[in-house]
Structure formats: structure tokens, C-alpha cells
């Protein structure tokens, strides 16, 4: 009897999890963190406990700076890797770090990953 109750609870948790992951809406790309200054596109990403926003839409064919902002960041998000450009650095615990990207083609994306591989962000170019 006790085994049946446990099996039922486990089955409900699995079904509920599957329902949650298949019905949630896809993430919408942010544009609020993108500005154009002196002919360059600035994409601001905050690193503290996670990267925010995790998905950004930016303009293609334009020089871009990814501006990483930290404020008391002492977790794995301070160890940033951007594989597509060979960038790997430890960000300051507080401050800003600019990462220059060459103009990207339409449809390209650039992803940043934390030192443990737990958190990431992506900039998609349209």
C-alpha cells in the first residue's frame, strides 16, 4: 500500500514537470538593454548570481560592445567565457568590462558562459 502511494506521487511529479516544461512560453529577447553610442551598439548584461537578461536581440552588421556590469559579484558568473571570440576572463567584483565584438551577420548569436557552465546569456543578431 505504502509503495503504491509513493509510486503515485512520483508519477504525478513527473507528469507535472513534463506539463510545465512543454507548455511554458519561450523566452522573449530583450532590447531594453541595447543602446547605440558613437556608431557602436552597446549591450548591457548584469552578472551577479546569473546573467540578466539571458537573451538579447541586437542589430546585425554593426560593431558591438557587450558591457558586463558587476556589483559585489563573487560567484561563478564573474568567470566569463565567450567561446566564439576566444574570450576568457575573470570580471572585477564591482565595475564594468567592455567586450568588443566585430559586426555579426544576420542570424548569428554570441553566447557567454560562466565558469561552472551553470549560467549563460545569448545575444542574437537580427
Regions found by a protein language model. Give the residues of each.
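Extracellular/periplasmic metallocenter environments
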Residues: 25-37, 91-126
Amino acid at each position: 500500500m505504502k509503495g503504491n502511494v509513493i509510486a503515485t506521487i512520483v508519477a504525478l511529479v513527473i507528469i507535472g514537470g513534463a506539463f510545465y516544461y512543454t507548455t511554458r512560453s519561450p523566452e522573449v529577447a530583450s532590447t531594453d538593454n541595447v543602446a547605440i553610442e558613437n556608431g557602436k551598439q552597446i549591450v548591457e548584461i548584469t552578472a551577479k548570481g546569473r546573467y540578466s537578461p539571458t537573451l538579447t536581440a541586437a542589430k546585425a552588421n554593426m560593431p558591438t560592445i557587450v558591457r558586463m556590469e558587476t556589483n559585489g559579484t563573487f560567484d561563478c558568473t564573474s568567470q566569463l567565457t565567450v567561446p566564439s571570440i576566444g574570450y576568457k576572463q575573470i570580471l572585477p567584483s564591482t565595475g564594468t568590462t567592455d567586450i568588443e565584438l566585430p559586426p555579426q551577420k544576420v542570424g548569428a548569436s554570441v553566447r557567454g558562459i560562466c565558469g561552472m557552465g551553470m549560467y549563460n546569456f545569448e545575444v542574437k543578431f537580427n
